[in-house]
Design a protein with these regions (language model features):
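Compact nucleic-acid interaction/catalytic patches
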Residues: 9-53
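C-terminal terminal-subdomain/extension
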Residues: 56-100
Length: 100
């Protein structure tokens, strides 16, 4: 079962793409068949390469909350890790700042 903060591979693509689930627990529990996500890029990118990113230490990678997307829950595979509550909060703050 997908939960808030999970990092999961996309199963609707031929490429190896990962996303982090930004939907809160209420949205996930509502079981709408959709979740709010953003891309997760495995590995490190240079600190000055992009603005509005969130660095993740385990698994090592970067969230791109500026590129928020709705996906069907069925498009996600088994989670490979989680971003943690601090990183999830930071990503949600970036998304909120972009639309307020």
């Amino acid at each position: 079962m997908i939960t808030s903060g999970d990092i999961a591979p996309r199963q609707d693509s031929n490429s190896e793409l990962y996303v982090a689930v930004l939907s809160n627990s209420i949205h996930v529990a509502a079981n709408t068949g959709r979740v709010i996500t953003c891309p997760f890029i495995p590995g490190r990118i240079p600190d000055d390469a992009m603005a509005m990113v969130v660095l993740i230490s385990e698994p090592v990678g970067t969230l791109l909350p500026e590129l928020v997307q709705w996906l069907p829950s069925s498009a996600l595979g088994e989670p490979i890790g989680t971003v943690g509550s601090a990183a999830l909060g930071e990503a949600a703050s970036i998304v909120a700042a972009l639309i307020s």
